[in-house]
Every structure is written in C-alpha cells, then in structure tokens.
Amino acid sequence: MSLRDRFIQPDSKAGPFAGTITGALIACAIAGGSVYAQPDQSTAESEPADESPVVLQQIPDAQTPDAQYPDDPDSGDRPASAGRVVRAFDFEEREYNPLPIPLGWLRAQEDPDVPRIRPGFPIWNGATIEYNAPAFSGIGTARLPTAGGSTSLTLRHGEINIFPNADYLVSARVRTDGLEHAKARVLARLLNEHGVAIEGAVSTTPLVNTKGDWQQVALEVEGVYPDAAFIQIELELLQPEQQGLAHGMNKFAVWEQDYSGDAYFDNLIIAQLPRLDITTGLPGNIAESNEPPPLQVLVRDLTGDAIVARVRIFDVFGREVARSVLPNHDRRLRTDWTPDLPGFGWYRAVLDISVDQQLVGIRTLDFIWSSPGEANINSGMFSIFAELTNPIIAESAPALIKGSGVTRASIETWDINTQSESLVDGSALMNTIDDLVNAQIDLSMVFSQLPRELATTLAVDPDEVMPVFAGPSPAWVPWAGSMLDEYGQAVAHWRFGDQPTLESAATLNAELDRINSALRGYVPGPMIVTPWAIDRPIEPTLTRPNRQLLLMDHGDTSEAVMPLVVEEWFASARSQTQGKPDQLPSLGMVLSPSHEIRTWSSVEIWSSVGGLARKAISFWWAASLTGLDNDRFDLELRDAWWVSKGKRGQVMPAPEVVVWKTLATHLGGRSAIEQIDLVPGVHMLVAGPQQIRANAQTSQDGRFFAPGSDEAQAGEDESGIMILWLDEPSLDPVVLNLPVSMGAVSSFDVFNNETVIDLERVGGLSLPVHRIEIGRSPIIIKGVNTQLVRFLSSIKLTPDRLQAKSGIHHHSVTLSNPWPITIRGQLYIVEPGGYTDPDGNIDRSWEIKPRVLPFVLDPNEQSELPIELAYSLGELAGEKKLSFDVELQADQDYPLMRLERTIELGYDGIEMFATARKAQDGIVIVSVHVTNLLDVVQDFELIAIPPNESRLRRSINGIAPGEQAIREFAFTKADSGDQIIVALLLRDSSIRLNQSVTVP
C-alpha cells in the first residue's frame, strides 16, 4: 500500500509516520519557528497521575472557538481532515496517473491563456512527476526543472479542507541538483470557502540548496483565521530575484540565475498538530517578583488520539529543574502551573505532546524570573536596544526596558519596512515612545535604515542613512520631521545608521557637521551617534564635543580589550578638547550575546553569559576610572530578545537580560576605587557606595524630596562592593578566606541570586573570616568595608620573589592607609615559620627579623617596613605561604585578622623543571631541563638525590644565554610515590635551586 493510500483513510492515526512528524517538528524548529531543538528529544513517558503537581481543567465548550466539534472526539465517523495526518503525497502514481504531473496539482507558471500573470515564472519551466530520478522513498518524486526563471507546482484549491482554528504542520523531503543560485522551498497558504487566498495567511519553509542530498523541511500553519476552509501547497524552485532579496530597491538590477538544474520533492505530509500554548502572560515574559511566575498552559487536540502531555523546565545549564505531567485522558485543557524554580534566572519551558511514544507537538517558552526592581536605583551608563520597528516588541518595550533594570534605552524607529503612517501622532510607535518619555527613560533615537519608500524615492541604498540626512535634499523631513518636532526637546542622542561606518574621518566629520546644523532647529545641542567597529583604530578628529563614538563589539573580543579602547578614546578626546571636561565627547559600547539565542546549547549559553558580564564590567570599570560622569558613556546591550515566529509570536528574552539587570542594579551609580591583588589568578575590583537617581524622588506616601536631601540620602547604600572572577577557566572554584567587613556580606551571582556569607570565627585565636567561592562567572559582594579590604590588600612583601641562595635577604613589608584618619597597629609575620600550626610545630629553617612590625600611618600614607629573611639551603623552590596576623585601630578597633599570601622561592637567572618516567625495565628516568635566562654564559652542577640509593651528579658547562640543556638520571631502586630531589648549583656562587619530582 502506498503512502497516499495509507493516509486517506478516515481513521488515520499518526501510526508509523509519527516519527516523520517528529522529524518535521525538529526541522521546523531549525527553521527558526516557534519550536526548536531541546536537550532531550525523548517523548513523554506514561507517569502516574499523582506525580503531576498540577490540576487541569477542561475548557467549557461554549467559551471556545472550537465548540462546534463534538464533546467526544472519538464518537461517530471522523473525516480525514480530523485525523493526525490530513493528507500525504508520496508521488507513487505510475499505476493510475497518465498525466505528466501529480494528480490534483497544476503548473503555476505565467500563462496568458489562463490568464495567469506571474513574472519570473516562464511557461517553459514545466514541473513533472518523475520515476527515473532517485526518490527519497519508492520511485516517484515531483521534479521542478529550470531552464532560466523560477518554477512552481501548486495544489489545486479545494484539495485539502481544514478546521479554521486548528494548527497544521507541512513537511517534505527536498533535494536540489545542479543549482548554484536558485533554491527550493515549500509554501502553504490558507484559502476561504470560495477558494480565495486569505491576506497574510502564507507560511514557507526556509530556502534550501541541498547540493544533491535529501533534506527535510517543514513549516507550521497557525489556525488564527476564522474564515479558513482550505490549505493550498506550492512547491517552488526560486531564482534569486524571486527569493525576496531585492526589497524592491533596484528595478533595473541584473540578477544572477541558473539556466539548468532541478529541485525534487518527496514524502509531502500535511498533519494536524495539537494546539499548544505556553506563556507567562507578562509583556516580554519577564517576571519581576519574589515568587516564581505561574505559566499559562493550553492544550487542545482534535484528532481523537490518546495524547500524553508534559511541561519541563530547563535552566541555563540545560538541567531539568521542574516537571509536570498532564493527565492523558483530556484533550482540551487549560491550567496555570507555578513551577518550583531553584532561583532567579533564565529558563526554558518545554510543552510537548506525544502519541504512542512519538512526538507530535511541541512549544517552548523562554522566560526570566528576576528580583523585583529596586526603586530610585541609578542604572548609570547601562542601556538597552529595543526594536520598536517590530510591533510585538514595541508593544512590550516599556516592560522589556524596565525588566532589564536600566533607565536608558536606544530605540529603533526606522528600518526598511517602516511605513509613513507609523510615524504620525497617535500611531502605536509614537504612543510607545510617549510612554517611555513619560517613564523618564533617557532615550537615544535610532534610524537604522531608510524606509523602503524613501530609499526608492532617493534611489539610494537603505543603509545610507547618514548621507541622506547630511545631504541637501529635504526628502527626509516628511519622514523624520514630526518625530524631531515631538521629541527634540526630550531626546538628545540621535543615531543615523546602525552598522559600523566605513567612511573616512574627513567624510564623516563633514557629514556630521551638516547633520548637526540640520538638527539644531529641532534639537538643542544634539548628540550625534556614530557606529564604529571596535577593531578599527579610533580617529582622533571624531572625538569632538556633541559627538558619541559607538563601538560595535563582536564575539571574538575579550574583557581585556575594554580598558584598551576606553584609554585610546580618552586620550584622543582630551587631545581634541584640550582637556576641558565640559567639552568632552561621549563614548558608547554595544555588546551582544555571543550565542544564538534561539538555539539550545547550555555550555555555549553559560559561556556567553559570563563573557558578556566580564566585558560589561571591564568597560564600566575603565570608564569609571577616567573620572568622567556616567553621562559621557553608554553601555548598550542589543539582541537581548527575539520574537517567536507566527501570528501568536511572543517576545522571548535572552539570559543576558537578567545579567544586564543585575549589573545595572549593583554597578549603576557606583564609582571604581581600586583593583586589588589578594589571590593569584583572581580579578578583584573594589567600588564605592551607590548613588540614587539624579532626578528628584518621591516617597511612598507621595511626598517630594530633592536629590541630596537627608530624606533622599537616608536610603542610599553606603557600603561598597567587590567584583570577583577567575581570570582563566577552572573546574574548581577558588576560595577567598578574608574578612571583607566585620559583619555578614551578600554574594550575588549574575542572575542576582543572593547568598549570605556570615563572618566566621576560626581557630584558637577566633580569627574573623569570610569564605567566598570565586568562579569564572563574576560575583558581586555587597556590604564590603572598602577601606579595610584595600588596607589588607596593600600588605605585601617587596620584592615578592625570594632568591635561592644562602645568606640574609633584605626585603620590605609595604602597607598603606586608605582611611581619612590616622591608623596604627602591628603586623605579625607568622608564615613561613610554622606559627600557624595548630600543634605548635615551629619551622626553625626560616629566620625572619623582626617578626613583629608596629606601624602608624597618616591618611593616604604608604610605608615600607624593612625585614631580613634567611632560610635553609635545602628549601624547595616554588610557592611559599606568607601569612600576616594584623592588629588594627582605624575607624574602629578591629579584632586580630589574618592575611594569607604566597611568595615564590626561585632564582631570576634560571628556569628549571624536572620530570620522572618509568622505562619498560622498571628503571626510573629523571629528566632535568635547565634554561639560562641571563645574558651571560653560566655553568651548573646538578645533583639528583633519591631516597633509597646513592645520589648522582651531572655537569652543565657553558650554557649560552637563552639556551636550554637537558640532563638525565637513571635509578634502579626508586618506587612509585618516591620523592627525588634535584638540586641545581651555580658554580662559584651560593645559589642552590631545589626541586622535587614524584616517581609515577
């Protein structure tokens, strides 16, 4: 029985082709629709009803648009259109179809005899049903050839009737052969009962060129058209001119095309999908609350199949954190389910439906659960980009901007599809801008592209926004004049174009001067924004007053680049303005997620989240160190959300949105103080107290108070913060053991989850300590005593490298006073020496004089306290623990505190490392590599000392500067785990460098 025969039966179930539907769902996902691949494609298994924490309710028939269907979908005869697979075409028609094309199909080429006017689809391209070409299955396939121009094969209207409120999936196998420019796709359109196409009711698969391979493509048709009666399918081979690439810009363009080649289609299936919806019901799907948001779940299936439905929640790491299995005996269900989530963050909810353990429907939802927004917080330079040219985003824009925790936003008001009617008073776009202005959002207007109509009128490329505004023609005035009139007094920043410019500095300056003159009639003192590639050297002449250079970052940069570009810009700006702060220009930075936000890869997402946070913090830090006001900088996040495909599309936020909110909440209004060094390999930044928003404030009872007043300052956070992360990736976190205040502090991750870290008292001396775990992703420690941390960080040994030679070594202990008052106290050097050993075992091989160092420091004074060190010649090289116990009287009498550092014992003129290996005969071979780091010839003696046999000696004579020598030792009695000491002696000196190597 053919595929066609199997699926024209009235009682068709998904049957053996449910797997095909599953594959089509995944193909539809890859196409960028509202469903996409998940970390676990397994289908819902049957689970006991009591494992589901959610109680579902049936939708009353009278309240639903599908009330026309019987209450029992299994009762009576069911038409084919009510089955899971509505229609299937396998093109196996050789036995009964004498026509050159499949039954029920027609060649939709341009034909004046029909008449059918269809430019680009010449009549000489005729689709056929082919039995000799390789088919995906069987022998039949639909072939669409080209001899120049595009080709179409269209299903006659009335062939497939549908339910108006049901969703459908169209899947096909496609293969192209001999094509270079042309591509293939499947199109589906909805028709009304008269066979007339419904406006806007068209869906397509992606255009593909498979280069001879079979590929599955799929599309989804949403049941949002109440007058839909039929679905019409069109198979297409499209040349570039028909692929939608032109945007109607150049009517005289010469298009490349193929003059030979074919597209083949096979196993075309039209299947009815369950109606699935899942949402938070909140604009932008951002929930700001102390409790997890309830998810609104809708399941409706009209096929009569026994379905199993489940909802699963995944976190940013791809871990399943919550699940609900819906009772499988209901087919029209609605529920509000509140998942038990582990903390604030970004989550992906997956609602899937299966029949006989085969996936037949899936919907996903990306949402954010974040902490409630804090009133009066100044987000500083943090900003976000919102595409108001997308109506769905525009509708949610106020909530999206609020949910990202910022008080600044760049809003896209023009793109190529902008219509003139959307730019007049009372339009949805203008109303949204009004809402943002009234919410006191500091806006930057972005004209990303010229509207198509304007670009066509001027015969220019739509990306040439700046040249058009700088030109003599006033053609832009009807498009931008009303917006400039309306918002010129409230908006200072205006961006013309949204891609990094390639123009020379001279050309740009001329254009910017003309634009500035044109805008002065609308905007007092406009700040004109110029996008600039981050890897392009900054032109000093562009750093002028009333100019903002907006650096466009890309995913290949690291956080180390941020301070470099800020320093480069600052130097140029000062040189151009003779250092006058009131005339300095502005600098912006645009950051984007480095991952594809629609797809699933937990490792990629988390890496992107951490990388973006480090970049943002590094830019904020470098900008703050310039001493300029935050108003001189913009740190913009873009590509922060996406809109799911389809008429029911909703805004899906990226994980970076909640990261941005966390950074804006904690860093906005703060100033950089100092980068400190307490733990090797850990980035440590100390920032000061946070200021409230600069504008006037209103209390909860409605009373007005001015910024800086006692009432306003009473709510300010006077404590500082530390920002910590590992400089390099590590499987294990590093623990900082240090008192950073005299009370509990709070650690916040990038999703603003708070962990309270109590001040512990440890050991017999009851030393205060906070234990702070530090990973690659930044954490923010709040409640920090910044003077105390800076003081402890200033205590260090200089030089911090001990030379491996006999005798007394002269060093100093440095420390400084960050308080505005005089401080005093004592330092005790307790390691090296064993004075921290709980059993009291003192290490006499180290001599340090004096071990007790009293100090008195005036405000901002730095002191060096001299000490002498001596140690045994047998001391092993490498890192050594250096510990200070600190007594301090400053702004308070602090308890005895311990500071732990590391110092290195080595020799500056030598690099040595040793390895051990076992040969096949059991002999242990120790290899020693010695490199001369000085610019003079050196001579060495090597001694290898095993535990159970005689020591061996080797010489290295005349090793030249920069050269390396290798010597080997063989031992017959060494066992696994034995430590072999290798001593390197520089001839005619007291230098002795000792290393140990472990026998494997």
What are the residue ranges of the model-derived segments?
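An active-site-proximal structural segment forming one wall of the substrate-binding cleft
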Residues: E464-F496, T507-Y522, P540-L542, K615-I617
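Active-site groove signature of glycoside hydrolases
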Residues: V477-T507, I534-R536, P545-H554, P585-P593, ...
